[in-house]
Amino acid sequence: MAGSDAEWVTIANNLLFKCHIHLRIHELQDCDANVFIALYQSILGEKVPDLIVIPRSQEDDAHNVQAVIDSLALDYLQVSLSHITGENIVKGDKESIKNLLEIFDGLLEYLTERISETSHEKSETEQYFKESDRGERLEEPESTKESKSSWKRVSFGRCSLSSEMLGPSWDGDEAESTGEIIRLGDTAHTFSLRSNGAQCPNEMLSKKALASPSSKSHEDMLYPPSVLSKSRTSFVEDTETLSVSGIPNARKLGEPIRAAIPLHPPYHPSEPRAPCPIGKEYLHSSHCSPAVNSTGEHTEFSGDLDDGLFLISKLPKGSKWEVYPAQVQGPRTRKPPKGKRNENRATASSCNSPFPQRPRKRLTEQELHDVSEKLSQRLSELDWMLKSALGDRIKEKTDHKEENTGNEEVEDGTEETLSQHSDGIVEYGPKKSRPGLSMRRKPPYRSHSLSPSPVNKHKQFHLERKRQRKPRETDVRQFQAQAFTEAFERELRRHKVQENIGPLRIHEKEEETEKIYRGEAVRKGTPECSQPWKIYSRKTTTQSLRGGLPKPNKAVPMKVSEHSLLPLMLEQFPFLYVSGPTLSKMWKQQIAQVEQLKKEACRENRSKKKLQDEIEEALRRHDLLTTLVKKEYEHNKRLQDFKDCIRRQRLTQSKIKENRQQIVRARKYYDDYRVQLCAKMMRMRTREEMIFKKLFEEGLNIQKQRLRDLRNYAKEKRDEQRRRHQDELDSMENYYKDQFSLLAEAISQEHQELKAREKSQAQTLHKVKRELRSKMEKEIQQLQDMITQNDDDVFFRELEAERFRSRLQLASFQYSKSPSL
């Protein structure tokens, strides 16, 4: 038994060591309420329900231990633990302590196994994506490796950081979440570079209006829309608002936008990076490549960007991937016509280039398709909302500023071939400029191509064009900052009015204005724009095979007044929850930003360069504000995803395994308890039998010894009386001869002595009886008190044995009296 106790002491100390609890026990009885409460809180990470923090008595300790046992039985194990009670634990019952220690040991082992399994699955998926991205980068030409090296390090570092920070609670079934981490992480990174991208917004928009689909996708990757709201809060006021991507099965704006996985704060580089590798690398990370099925054929896969729908047809094994840019529709009519898709297929099928393909290892076809649809739908919805919020305001400012700008000739878009996440290639044909549209040409960010011959010429040409556009870009950037300053001033004035008349009336008025404007826009249609860089809603066109004119894509802009951005966002996201303090904080931050920008804009006596630096600083602070809001939103998403993962793990993945373990554990506990109870009953019966046998033997011995003593005592008394009687007779005969009178006195005196002796003997006997009676009554009273206090059967038998022994003693003493008479 001692060895068993030592083993359980070792188990308890190991549990305390694994849980980092600075307690050590030396005996099994040292496992009191504090030990089990500490184990519960350390293993399960929760406070004990109904806990008495400062126990003042043994009953409080028993209550705390019972609360631990009840929580384990009801909340985690779903089995009955009635054989373990808090009172027995506090009293130091070894069996109860062992059972509870065994439960905690098994629970810790089970949780450790689950954590290791999920961590292993996460590390395997993360390692696969790392190897996939690394292999893709090794296949790129030597001409592009040097320009992309810095961005690769950033992308890999950010991807691994996001994967490692997820923890073991990430659900193993959501394998597609890792790919979304890479894409959304790059999106968050490019958001930090928007201050650099704001230098030439108008030229960039003119480039996007007539460039090829590949260059459009490239620009989309350079300036993606970002979510900045916590539940129903604000989103980014971007200086370039992209058009809506047309996808057949896109979600409506009323449905919730669910983040695939919690994001971490974006990586802010300390040195500027070239936009060319940013766009290229983002395209790698924002597309999931199609898998190769078991029959040797490449399945169809649609990868959606902001304003391009790429259709990959089903090809036999060994052939090339063919990717076709499809016609993009407006936010209300999303499905492109069938004839236009056929024309796009015919256009893009003429420029295919072979590229090695690698089959995917883990993600299935359906998972890849779902990931692509989720990302494209999110980007398209956010793009449309950003465009609606800011497009009209910036359009008015740009129209006023760019009225006298001269027209320049437009160059044809260069042919580019992009690899799609290391599994296929995306090829685009040259894009002809639209006749009748002349605009300024922004130097393209991506001058590289997979064909190595014209790379250097294109780079030289674009560098020269960029140097020529530097003064114009500076003017455009200053105008853009001024436009934002004026917009924030109007926002501030509107907020002051809103404080006087109430937010509800303004919200209703904005809804009516929005409905009227949308109705007029639907009736009149989208106005023609001779200079596409003046508006934020781009018109994506597709060159047909026969050289026909591309049709503009119609998008309904949204009017956003000064202080209606946050109410409009609350209207567009009615399904998101925003707490009162968060909403008030957003209003205060926006108003503070508006006031500061207003103060900076009103200082006309400053120099031009100083004013420009202040406006850029205000824009940077605005980006920091939006980053903070985004972090808050992502934090809430991480918490929600963490809770969802735990709930799914408990309800779906681990349910069968936990049920089996619970059945086995309950059966084991029942068998152990039954064996222990049987052994205890056998020991009890054996002990009672031994007590009865011992009592009988002791009674026999006492009876024999008492009889011997009584016989010896009676014999001694008889001998003594006989000797004394003989002496008296002799003395009487002697004295009778001498003195008759003395003899008579001696006889009378002897009679008196005999009477006195008999009287004293009777008194002594009566005194002994009274003492024995009082002693027996006292012992009987004590035995009765002990019987009422302790109902143990063994102790009851011992009391009966003592009472029977006392009765034997009393009976034997009465028996010894009869021979003396």
From Swiss-Prot:
Positions of the UniProt region annotated as Disordered: 118-149, 323-369, 395-475
Compartments, as annotated in UniProt: Cytoplasm, Cytoskeleton, Microtubule organizing center, Centrosome; Cytoplasm, Cytoskeleton, Spindle pole
Biased composition (Polar residues): 345-355
Residue numbers of Phosphoserine PTMs: S449, S451, S453
Biased composition (Basic residues): 431-445, 456-470
Predominant location: cytoplasm
Coiled coil residues, start to end: 585-632, 700-794
A Pfam entry, by short name: DUF5745
Keywords: Coiled coil, Cytoplasm, Cytoskeleton, Phosphoprotein
Domain of life: Eukaryota
Compositionally biased region (Basic and acidic residues): 395-404
GO cellular component: centrosome; cytoplasm; spindle pole
Acidic residues compositional bias, start-end: 405-415
InterPro entries for the chain: CEP95, DUF5745
Protein name per the record: Centrosomal protein of 95 kDa
Organism: Homo sapiens
Protein's gene: CEP95
